[in-house]
Amino acid sequence: MHRSLANYERNPLFIFLSGVLGEKETSRLFKLYCVGTSKKWGGSTVFWQIDRQGKVRAGKIMLYNPTTGHRVKEPKSYVSWVHTELELEHFNMKQCLFGEHLLAGYPTKAVAIVESEKSALVASHFMPDFVWLATGGIHGCFKADTVGVLKNRAVILCPDLGAKMVWQEKVQLLSSVCSKVVFSE
C-alpha cells in the first residue's frame, strides 16, 4: 500500500481535485484517507480500505477523467482490485468501509456515510465536523460484521439520488449498533 501513496502527478483524480481544492488540500486528503496511485490504465486511483486496527483489507482501483473528475465508464467501466492485479491466488477479501481507519482518531465525531469514495474525500473538505466514510456503492459494506465499528456513534446517511429506498432497508441493522441514525435532507 505505502508504495502507492505517491506519483500523484499522474493520478487523474488528484489532478482534478487539485484544480478544485488546491494541491495542498488534495495532498492532505489523499494522505488522510490513504488514497494511492496505480500504474493500471496509465495512472489511476487506489482507494485503500483500511480497518480500525490499521489492517489493509482491500484496494479498489478506479480510473477518473482528470478534466471532469468523473469516473471513466466508456468503452468499459474501469474498476479493478489490487489483489486481482497482483494475482494473489489465495487472497480472502474482507471489505470494510472506506475511511474506517479514521474512526479511532475521532472517537466523538459524528459519522456521515456516502456511497462513493470520491464523495467522502470532497465532503471531508467541505464539512470537516464529520468523519466521512464510503460504502463503495449502493449496496456496499452494509453488513452486520462491517457496521459493528459504528457502535455507539451518531450516523448520518447520505445516499446518492435514487438510493434512499435501498438504504432505508439498512436502518434497522444500523440502529442496532449506532446511538442515532438519520438521513440527510
Ranges and model annotations:
Residues 24, 130, 153-154, 178-181:
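Secondary-structure boundary/capping positions in well-ordered alpha/beta enzyme cores
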Residues 134-138, 180-185:
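A generic structural motif
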